[in-house]
Amino acid sequence: MRSIIADSKRLVVKVGSSLVTNDGKGLDHAAIGRWAAQIAALRAQGKEVVLVSSGAIAEGMQRLGWSKRPREIDELQAAAAVGQMGLAQVYESRFTEHGIRTAQILLTHADLADRERYLNARSTLLTLLRLGVVPIINENDTVVTDEIKFGDNDTLGALVANLIEGDALIILTDQSGLFTADPRKDPNATLVGEANAGAPELEAMAGGAGSSLGRGGMLTKILAAKRAAHSGANTVIASGREADVLVRLAAGEAIGTQLIARTARMAARKQWMADHLQVRGHVVIDAGAVEKLTAGGKSLLPIGVIDVQGAFARGEVIACVGPDGREVARGLTNYSSAETKLIHRKPSGEIEIVLGYMLEPELIHRDNLVLV
């Protein structure tokens, strides 16, 4: 089996906290130097690389003299602010040794949820790549709250892959890849060499939580691969403890687990909608509506809505949930939650009678709806 990275030109590389820190006690300068050297080697092969790196909070804890990760959000944000300075400095220093310029980009979900800011971020990243700069991306932990967190840098890496239409996402961790079961508990567990991104059985294999330093377990990596597949990006989950892992992957060596994007590439606008992590509300739809959306490619009409949950405004992203509670689609709503509560279960011809006006005959037009 040949590594999919060999034939990939535009890469997003995500490096976890444990691979850039000294067991959480500040940054490991030597390790960061090795990552810079490997990325420089990939660049010399003509590959474009965007780096998503953890480590800011761990570095901030070290600089502030804290031995345990704080629980209070304001202290975490303070640690991130202090540590981000060191993280950027070390990366800049190490890449300069190879004649490569770096750029620091801090993102929040709000940056990508707003269409204009999303396009601006995309334009900036593509310009940096064109200029031969290596963008180094992290979540802007200083300003985010639990409500608007990406949740982990695996998810952020997938969103960046979609944003720049990357060919592949490489998630480097302290694990060898995805196993059929937890190898610490099951001696018969075997490494999954290759599978389809988004295959339902993968999520069952990937139970478990992450380390105390980071937030992402194997499940977040599997879900990130599924999300990256929206733009056609393949994913490799591999151990960052492997010597020269990036160089070897680029040479075609199969390391870890590679998850192939088999689904059709989404149109850019629909991909943006699918990548919304926080939807503003939910509508429960009947089985007939589920069938029309998933098999017929139809719009969602008010008559197919059973229940309305949450508060949302016109133009916001809402999720469509089937009778079994499973999300089947999401899209931009033509009506607010208050309006939807009045017109649900009604044929479109009665919208004007109920509301006194009709904005659109559909609750969500098929052009503004994406299956998930």
From Swiss-Prot:
Domain of life: Bacteria
Keywords: Amino-acid biosynthesis, ATP-binding, Cytoplasm, Kinase, Nucleotide-binding, Proline biosynthesis, Transferase
Pathway where this protein functions: Amino-acid biosynthesis; L-proline biosynthesis; L-glutamate 5-semialdehyde from L-glutamate: step 1/2
Reaction(s) catalysed by this chain's protein: L-glutamate + ATP = L-glutamyl 5-phosphate + ADP
Enzyme nomenclature, EC number: 2.7.2.11
GO BP annotations, alphabetical order: L-proline biosynthetic process
Family matches, as Gene3D superfamilies: Acetylglutamate kinase-like (3.40.1160.10), PUA domain (2.30.130.10)
Molecular function terms from GO: ATP binding; glutamate 5-kinase activity; RNA binding
InterPro entries linked: AceGlu_kinase-like_sf, Asp/Glu/Uridylate_kinase, G5K_ProB, Glu/AcGlu_kinase, Glu_5kinase, Glu_5kinase/COase_Synthase, Glutamate_5-kinase_CS, PUA
Pfam families for the chain: AA_kinase (PF00696), PUA (PF01472)
Amino-acid biosynthesis as UniProt keyword: yes
Cellular localization per UniProt: Cytoplasm
Residue positions binding ATP: 14, 173-174
EC primary class: transferase
Residue span, PUA domain: 280-358
Gene Ontology CC entries for this record: cytosol
Annotated positions binding substrate: 54, 141, 153
Described purpose of this protein according to its UniProt entry: Catalyzes the transfer of a phosphate group to glutamate to form L-glutamate 5-phosphate.
Family from the record: Belongs to the glutamate 5-kinase family.
The name this protein goes by in its record: Glutamate 5-kinase
Organism listed in the record: Burkholderia orbicola (strain MC0-3)
